[in-house]
Each structure stands twice: as structure tokens, then as C-alpha cells.
């Protein structure tokens, strides 16, 4: 669990911030890289780098161009292997697709995301058409309300609503393999 109810989460240049304070990264955090090699990465090096067989399978037909999640240690080890490696390039996503909320274009990416307030039971937010995409699913699906937008106005259970009080706590979960966690 990364974010707790009532906290504001933001990711800036891959660093997670909670309520404006940088979160310590786990020791084995992974980021994705494009890796061009002179020949396929062998089993011994795969094990040394801690790369799963599934991740190593993500390559081109001749096994010389990979999309790999690497820890800092694996990145440094692989960078020194000039006998195998031609180039390692960090994956940089300018604008993420399939990121929450999926019903609003935010311009956010997995490396630069938010800020997003995590709902807390008993807390009330001003509800606007601008922030509705962030909270529509919790309000309608998880808390079981009938939520509709008609003529530019928000209705919850048939009543026009400009605010909402959450009845449940929510959490932000994110794994160590950051580019495959959102």
C-alpha cells in the first residue's frame, strides 16, 4: 500500500509524493528500459540480473531488442556488459493510456501523475464536472449510488449534488515494478 485514505498522491519524475513529502523507494524498485543487444541475453546473465523468464521473453524476433524492467543494480550491471549491450534507453511515457481515470484525459503518465486526493470515509469534497471523473467510480460503483450528469449538473440518487461525503476508505496500491503497476 502506497497511499492511505485522505492523503494526496503525486508522482513527479518517478518519485512518489504523499502530501508533498517524497516517499522512499523500495530497494528493488524497477523501471522499464529498452535494451539493444549484440546477441540474445543468456540464461546465466538473466539470473544474475534477476529478470524473470517472462520479462526476458518480451523481445524482437532475433532476441536482440528487449523491453525490460530493471532494478538500479541490474541496470548498472547490464550497462557494464559492453560485450553484449549496444544501448540501454529508459522508457519515458509522455502521456499514459489506460491510466486512472480512464474517462478523462489528464496528460498524466506513470512517471508524472496527479495530484490525486485519496478518498477517506467521512470526508466531504466539492463535486464538480472537472473532478467527477476521479471520483465517479467510487461514488457510483463502490458506494452504490445512482450518479448521473444531466444538463451540466451532477445528480446523486436523483438529487442535484455539489458535494459528496465518502462512506468508505480508499487506498492507493502500487507495486515495485513501477511501469507495470498503474
Where are the regions that the model predicts?
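Extended hydrophobic leader/signal-anchor segments used for secretion and membrane insertion
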Residues: 1-182
Amino acid at each position: 500500500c502506497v497511499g492511505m485514505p485522505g492523503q494526496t498522491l503525486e508522482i513527479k519524475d518517478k518519485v512518489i509524493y504523499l502530501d508533498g513529502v517524497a516517499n522512499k523507494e523500495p530497494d528493488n524498485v524497477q523501471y522499464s528500459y529498452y535494451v539493444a543487444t549484440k546477441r540474445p541475453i543468456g540464461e546465466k546473465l538473466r539470473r544474475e540480473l534477476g529478470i524473470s523468464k517472462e520479462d526476458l521473453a518480451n523481445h524482437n524476433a532475433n532476441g536482440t531488442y528487449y523491453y525490460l524492467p530493471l532494478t538500479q543494480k541490474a541496470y548498472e550491471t547490464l550497462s557494464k556488459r559492453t560485450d553484449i549491450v549496444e544501448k540501454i534507453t529508459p522508457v519515458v511515457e509522455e502521456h499514459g493510456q489506460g491510466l486512472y481515470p480512464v474517462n478523462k484525459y489528464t496528460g498524466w503518465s506513470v512517471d508524472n501523475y496527479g495530484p490525486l486526493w485519496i478518498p477517506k470515509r467521512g470526508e466531504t469534497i466539492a463535486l464538480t464536472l472537472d473532478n467527477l471523473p476521479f471520483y465517479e467510480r467510487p461514488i457510483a460503483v463502490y458506494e452504490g449510488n445512482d450518479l448521473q450528469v444531466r444538463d451540466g449538473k451532477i445528480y446523486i440518487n436523483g438529487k442535484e449534488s455539489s458535494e459528496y461525503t465518502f462512506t468508505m476508505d480508499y487506498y492507493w496500491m502500487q507495486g515495485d515494478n513501477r511501469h507495470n503497476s498503474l
